[in-house]
Amino acid sequence: MMQGILIVDKPMDWTSFDVVAKLRGVLGTRKLGHSGTLDPMATGVLPVFCGGASKAVDLQLNHDKTYRATLRLGARTDSGDSTGTVLETAPVTAGEKELLAVLPQFIGPQMQVPPMYSAVKINGQPLYKLAREGVTVERKARPIEIYGIEYGGSPAENEYVLTVRCSKGTYIRTLLEEIATAMGQKGTMSALRRTAAGLYTEADAHTLEEILAAKEQGRAALEALMLPVESVFTPLPLLVVEPWVEQHLYNGCPTSRYPAADGRYRVRNAAGQFLGLANITGGVLRVEKLFVERN
């Protein structure tokens, strides 16, 4: 079974689940997981964890995201983006000057109410299903953080491109609506592309067409597109262990008086093979998660 991380450039009009379902057929395995759901209208970086690498989805060190989004002024929709039904229109009376003036107030930690058209669940029911039935319910605001917003110009009348660096759980649709409101305008998101997810960027991503072409060339070509699972953990210090310590890790046995500082480590064996994660506390080395089978 292939193991690694395949960074997909998600096409427009595909759900994240559509991409995973397609890759199950391409890779010949159901053991896949993805990180960071993208709306169907969005494109861009979607990390897909294959085989044993799927165990790393919940262990990622960096969940921050970067998006390139387009704000369109003049109308507000029920979904917060241009795929939704227009609820309200208004003449546009503000532009670039007003936009640049309000952006600084959106930088930093803040609370954000999830949109009705989202996968957040209330009493086990996804909000988007309630929204499709015309039902609106109260949602609790959640903590998010906007690290930076860069202005990228105006590609068309009343449209403005923004690059947003933010924490996990940020809804860009909601952010753009709030920016429009601060400008005294009605607004909606007309385009969205994720350019980075955690440690991975557009430069790491492959289109579905490229992945399908690699499949035609054989297993080696597919594996060449994948990043090693260790890439998720590169911010952690590296610990290279002796063979007897490696066996302790396989057996789940702690190693006492280990000569290294306390902390969390990514671990390789003497041959350079990535084994997994381990923690040292009080000089005792303990395995956290293994990504290899026992020898």
Residues of each region from the PLM?
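Accessory RNA 3′-end/elbow-binding domains used by RNA modification enzymes
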Residues: 1-13, 17-34, 38, 42, ...
